[in-house]
């Protein structure tokens, strides 16, 4: 600054546009120039921030669309596995509904119940890797055939593994654990008690209740009275006692849900369910 004129010395601020503009300007005028440039810089920064937010929004929307497409593809694959086994999508929906309702009765958070409703429907996705001659065999399986059949939980878990989506992570857990027994006599890992993930313990009972109530190529459907007797007998052995108790506490609701799904055949795609599943059942 020149002590006599009050002007900025250009030689000491050569890199500053504001300084150059103010070289022959009184001090108050220099401040005004700098204020205008500062306001312009802030406005440009604000525009850049808005543009960045738009880019992030577009990225997030694209990611959600990709994740949704991935989930839908796997859900369709699970349906293909059901059809391969002679089932329809209604079995998947019933198991999903039963599992979510049992989880709710056990005091699980609503978000968990909603995710489980979707994840449980993919419990048998691994059957896509089992030959139809085994899945639809009318007689007893040979030891080799049974060994192959017991691999479907691992196959399903491997198909579903690696996703960051909570529903697919839980579906992988369900696939691997839904044939474990509380006593440790199940497969594929022989887990015991609470070492079995809760999702697997719940879906094990939901699947058992539904599967025995429908005709299969190797047996006729059991009446409900017989199925309920079997569940009571297997409490603490095949099934977690807490899960069994929750099941019987809401048995009337489960039966109504089954009737609703059967009547409609299919209520909706799991991919279209965005919450409040409990309002459906």
Features from the language model and the residues they span:
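Metal-dependent catalytic cores of enzymes that make or break cyclic nucleotides
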Residues: 2-13, 17, 22, 36, ...
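Generic short amphipathic/hydrophobic targeting helices enriched at N-termini
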Residues: 4, 27-29
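Active-site-adjacent bridging/hinge elements
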Residues: 69-72
């Amino acid at each position: 600054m020149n002590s006599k004129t009050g002007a900025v010395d250009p030689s000491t601020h050569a890199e500053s546009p504001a300084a150059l503009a103010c070289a022959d300007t009184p001090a108050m005028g220099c401040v005004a120039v700098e204020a205008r440039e500062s306001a312009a810089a802030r406005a440009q920064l604000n525009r850049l921030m808005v543009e960045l937010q738009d880019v992030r929004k577009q990225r997030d929307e694209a990611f959600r669309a990709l994740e949704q497409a991935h989930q839908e593809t796997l859900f369709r694959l699970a349906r293909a596995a059901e059809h391969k086994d002679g089932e329809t999508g209604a079995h998947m929906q019933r198991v999903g509904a039963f599992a979510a309702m049992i989880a709710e009765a056990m005091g699980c958070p609503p978000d968990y119940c909603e995710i489980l409703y979707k994840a449980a429907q993919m419990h048998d996705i691994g059957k896509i890797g089992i030959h139809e001659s085994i899945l639809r065999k009318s007689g007893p399986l040979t030891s080799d055939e049974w060994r192959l059949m017991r691999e479907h939980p691992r196959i399903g878990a491997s198909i579903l593994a690696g996703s960051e989506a909570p529903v697919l992570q839980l579906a992988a857990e369900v696939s691997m654990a839904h044939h474990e027994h509380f006593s440790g006599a199940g497969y594929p890992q022989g887990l015991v008690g609470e070492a079995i993930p809760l999702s697997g313990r719940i879906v094990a009972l939901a699947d058992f209740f539904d599967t025995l109530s429908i005709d299969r190529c190797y047996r006729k459907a059991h009446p409900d009275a017989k199925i309920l007797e079997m569940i009571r007998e297997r409490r603490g052995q095949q099934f977690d006692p807490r899960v069994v108790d929750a099941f019987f506490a809401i048995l009337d609701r489960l039966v109504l849900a089954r009737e609703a799904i059967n009547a409609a055949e299919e209520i909706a795609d799991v991919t279209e369910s965005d919450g409040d599943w409990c309002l459906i059942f």
